[in-house]
Amino acid sequence: MEVLVKAGGIYCFGFVIFHLMFWRIFNWGEDLKTLSFLNRAIMQVVNLSLTFAFVIFGYISLFHSRALLETALGHSLLVLMSLFWLLRAIQQVVFFKLKHWGSAIFLGVFLLGAVLYGVPAGNAIYPLQQSAHSGLGPRL
């Protein structure tokens, strides 16, 4: 499971690079000029804030993977990171409608993120439920 969590960290750092390239990829230097000052600022602030969230996800995944797998807080973070990517996949369908092949590829990429964190999350939580029935205490 630790390999999946660390792979999730690399995956998140891939999104850090991708989001930092938005200005070049999407020609934001020109395209954002068509927006109002407020909307232009919001787009850039949201993108940079999301990029920092990916740095956090990636850092925790790479350097604190054991804590993610072995602590209650870590289990919660794994579930939340998996839900983040699942919700992003749903948003891909809702807002991009999968009308372009690239949109379908991104759907798969976002579902991969949900799996990279969801499988370890499920595996980490299930043993916690089993430990209550391990013979160490009364069975409820």
Predicted regions and their residues:
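Membrane-helix boundary connector in multi-pass membrane proteins
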Residues: L86-I105, N123
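Sequence termini and other peripheral, non-core segments
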Residues: M1, F13, L86, I90, ...
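Core segments of alpha-helical transmembrane spans in multipass integral membrane proteins
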Residues: I10, G14-W23, L38-R66, V79-L87
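Interfacial loop at the N-terminal end of multi-pass membrane proteins
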Residues: W23-L48, A67-E70, L128-L136
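Interfacial segments of alpha-helical transmembrane regions
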Residues: M1-F13, G74-L77
